Amino acid sequence: MKVNQDTHNAQPKLIDSNESVGDRLNILVVSGRSGSGKTSVLNILEDLGFYSIDNLPLSLVPEAVQKLVCDSGIKRIALGVDIRTPRADLSNFAAIHDSLKQAYGEEAVTVMYVTAQEETLVARFNATRRIHPLMVLDTKGVENTAYNLPAAIEKEIQLLQPICKYADIKIDTSMLNIHQLKERLRDYVGVDNQIVINLLSFGFKYGSPIDADFVFDVRILPNPHWNPTLRAATGLDAEVGEFFADYPEVTEMTGDIATFLNRWLPDFLHNNRHTVTVAIGCTGGKHRSVFITKHLQDSLQNSLPEGLTVTAKHREKHRW
């Protein structure tokens, strides 16, 4: 697969649409110009389920891949290689690239090259006040006066050419913010279960969950706790459901929460969120919040787009 992608139009994917992301071996070699965002790409790929290694000498790539794939069973690997690798390794990239494809298959190995326009790179280095790798003479950080920044950027293009010419995908980050970069990478590599909705019932008397994205207080609803025959039951029991059936406000509140979540949860997906936690709280976390959490799970699972997972947990279950 050879796709050079510098525009926003086409969006090549590294996986077959009919194949599960987790079932396919995906070895992604990520290289590119200093300041173009290669490290950000590796961090995003790690968030997307890749085992990421940055600044790996090219000569060690075959050994690292073999250990990760054969010894650890890891199937999604992103290896960052850049100008800091020994120069002899760069000239030997073709042989390393071919050996990986022979060992793991043509479709398993992809080279991604990250770049940016020269004026963008200069602006980024000036903004961060970092020194270009080719302007550093030794490990003490002494600046190499043989290169100014534009010259170092131009020289790096020449040195990385052995990798660049094998690029299956090129990403120009000049006009991309971090959110757009995330979206682009998600399109390239594919993501199983792109977002998980975690519904959590809890009791306010034991404290509010600190990791919730949304918290709904349902203590205004009728409380089965005050019915002696229902005190030992929970919101998962049929008799509690029958109790709530006599109160239309319970159905109305459940519907209102579902409407709100159906409206806004898809936006979290487009904002590159992987999980969203929705907490439903009553006094003790046994009746009202449990009942609504269970019914919300059923409602959302049927109404949200396919591929989203809705889970339900009850924080106070050990207290029942």
Swiss-Prot record:
Entry's Gene Ontology molecular function annotations: ATP binding; GTP binding
Superkingdom, natural source: Bacteria
Residues binding ATP: G32, R33, S34, G35, S36, G37, K38, T39
SUPFAM superfamilies noted in UniProt: P-loop containing nucleoside triphosphate hydrolases (SSF52540)
Alphabetized InterPro entries for the sequence: P-loop_NTPase, RapZ-like, RapZ-like_N, RapZ_C
Record-listed GTP binding positions: D82, I83, R84, T85
Family: Belongs to the RapZ-like family.
Known role: Displays ATPase and GTPase activities.
NCBIfam families: PRK05416.1
Protein known as: Nucleotide-binding protein Psyc_0118
Gene source species: Psychrobacter arcticus (strain DSM 17307 / VKM B-2377 / 273-4)
